[in-house]
């Protein structure tokens, strides 16, 4: 019983960083709401930038990678960008594709960010140098990010999620097979 009770304060201490990250994400979302980012972006997309509408998922993907990489949090990126995406693209298959681009980019940027809590915990858990751990993850992340970017470029032109998703999976499989052939030739 005593060991169980002693574990409570340690558990609370372990949760403090995660709670702080979520609080910062909520604060960042509140700031973007007060600034009116949703309305500004929606007006921009429906106005002067309407010609770029077909490239929107790819742009959202790149923006969310950059935002998550620089802030070190995918959840904060979700909180900032998903409301903006939903305001800019209110309905249809393009909404699903755009929100998935936002979420995929945020997780990608968070995964390769050296200031991400998950990256820090993974390198600490593996007991390896933090920057070395980040560098070992980058080749894998960049291959998947490149395939995802191409898929998000193609998605608006195929028109439906039910074609875009198998197309992206096929592109990823083809990329892996090509990489396997290239790397097999080196050994």
Q: What are the language-model segments listed below?
A:
Residues 1-2, 30-41, 70-73, 148-162:
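Transmembrane helix-loop junctions in multi-pass membrane proteins
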Residues 2-40, 54-66:
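Core transmembrane alpha-helical segments of multi-pass membrane transporters/permeases
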Residues 3-14, 40-50, 120, 124, ...:
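Short amphipathic alpha-helical coupling elements at transmembrane boundaries
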Residues 22-25, 49-96, 102-110:
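Hydrophobic alpha-helical transmembrane segments of multi-pass integral membrane proteins
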Residues 22-30, 60-68, 86, 102-106, ...:
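Hydrophobic core segments of alpha-helical transmembrane domains in multi-pass membrane transport
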Residues 46-52, 157-168:
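Interfacial loop-to-helix junctions that mark the boundaries of transmembrane helices
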Residues 93-97, 126-142:
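Membrane-interface alpha-helices at helix entry/exit sites of multi-pass transporters
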Residues 108-121:
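Short helical (or helix-break) motifs at transmembrane helix termini and adjacent helical loops
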């Amino acid at each position: 019983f005593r060991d169980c009770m002693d574990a409570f304060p340690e558990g609370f201490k372990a949760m403090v960083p995660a709670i702080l990250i979520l609080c910062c994400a909520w604060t960042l979302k509140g700031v973007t709401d007060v600034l009116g980012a949703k309305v500004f972006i929606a007006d921009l997309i429906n106005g002067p930038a309407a010609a770029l509408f077909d490239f929107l998922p790819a742009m959202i993907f790149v923006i969310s990678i950059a935002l998550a990489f620089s802030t070190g949090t995918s959840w904060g990126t979700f909180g900032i960008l998903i409301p903006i995406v939903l305001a800019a693209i209110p309905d249809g298959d393009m909404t699903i594709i755009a929100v998935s681009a936002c979420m995929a980019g945020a997780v990608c940027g968070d995964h390769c960010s050296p200031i991400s809590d998950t990256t820090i915990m993974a390198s600490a858990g593996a007991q390896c140098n933090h920057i070395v751990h980040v560098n070992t993850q980058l080749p894998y992340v960049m291959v998947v990010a490149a395939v995802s970017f191409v898929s998000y470029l193609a998605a608006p032109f195929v028109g439906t999620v039910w074609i875009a998703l198998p197309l992206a999976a096929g592109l990823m499989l083809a990329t892996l097979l090509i990489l396997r052939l290239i790397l097999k030739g080196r050994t």
